[in-house]
Amino acid sequence: MQIPLIITLSLHVLSSVFWAGSSFTLARTGGLGGEKLFRPQMGAAVIAILTGAYLGHLVHAGVFGTAEKILAVGAFAALVAAGVQGAIGGRAIASLRRGTADEAGARSRIAVAQRIAAVLLAVTAVCMGAARYA
C-alpha cells in the first residue's frame, strides 16, 4: 500500500505546487500570460483535486476528526478556486480568443480570477499544513 500512497502524494504535491505557484504569479503580474497557462492550470487543478480525494480515501477513510474537518475546508477552498479560474478566467480568455471582448476588460477579469484563486489556494495550503498537527 505504500507505493500507491507515495505516487499519489507526489502527484498531488507537484500538481498543487504548479497550480498555486502559477496562480500566485499571475495574480502578481495582473494576469499577464494567463491565456497561455489556463489549460495547464486547469489540468493541474483536476489532478490536484482527484489525487487529494484519493489521499483522503487512503489516509483518512472512516474518520472525520479535527484534521479531516480542516482538510475539508481546504478542499472546499480549492474547488472554489478552480471554479473561479474556470468560470471567470476561462470566459475572459475565450472572449479574447474570439475577439469579442475589450482586451483591457478581459485582462482585468483574468487578473481578478487569479487573485481570488490565489487567496483561496493560500487558504488551502494553510489548511493542509494545519491539519497535520490538529
For the regions a protein language model found, what residue spans apply to each?
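Polytopic transmembrane helical bundles with strong interfacial aromatic enrichment
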Residues: 1-134
